């Protein structure tokens, strides 16, 4: 949903990324840490309170948490106690959809890009150290402890522009939090919001563009070189795995204590492989989005097997391996439309998945080296 004020006349010359929730799924892999920490003090996390802390600098977040939960600690003591719990999990954080593609594209075309995060610099370095080539490819890296004030102050973005020798009005900021979006606008920069909480997208109207995922990003709208990496009307993506129970065309995803294993930024119409009850493997089209109806917001995953009717599949265990992106999902108001598979979609699925690089056997061989347990493998 690339929208609103995209303007190629802006002549964007550099890009500034946020880190947590924008480039990396750190917020997802560490979401249980606060719950475990608060349990020691007889407290339970409040989701509404945690939403307001999205994007906060470490110091401000610590003060806010201690006050909100009335902890018998100073903010400094809280930080000293909780931070070691994070260190071991950062290595599990994965690049979010479209991130490696975009950074590689910018590097290939000589467009400088920087990293500006409300984390302190030491923690930034620890997080990105698990991703080969990342640190070396940023023209500048800034943490909240390297400027006078963290976001929503514009200080960090202005300093990043200065270090890249680019005027602020020629910089494009990519952010997942409202705090970060406000900082980018205060710096006089164009801002693309990719909300890490998709149910909150209505709050991001000050951004110049709002996307569900960086897979949707179109650099040519900002005067940057266009992507040319689609194959047979499909965009190859890093494999994404989903497991659950399939019935009546819908996949009920297995969740951990009410949390999805998927980042909110996995959104759109995908193609891939569906494995039924650990036996039959079929080509499939998968629609992923959110129903934002009234007070209930939930992810909706629809799957359509291409060469066999869905009607024969009821209450079965299904494992999906997404390997290609087709387009955005369709909405009517706040409701995700039922999946309608066009004949051209079927042709795209067959053509793409028949390519040797995306055959199921080839992907099995590739994924056998993955450190994450892969129940998709035979």
Regions found by a protein language model. Name each.
Residues 40-43, 69-73, 132-137, 165-166:
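Short helix-capping segments at alpha-helix termini
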Residues 22, 34, 81, 99-129, ...:
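Substrate-recognition element of Asp-dependent hydrolases with the DxDx(T/V) motif
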Residues 2-51:
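Active-site neighborhood of HAD-like aspartate-dependent phosphohydrolases
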Residues 64-101, 109:
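Metal-dependent phosphoesterase signature
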Residues 238-378:
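Phosphate/ribose-recognition catalytic cores of enzymes acting on nucleotide-derived substrates
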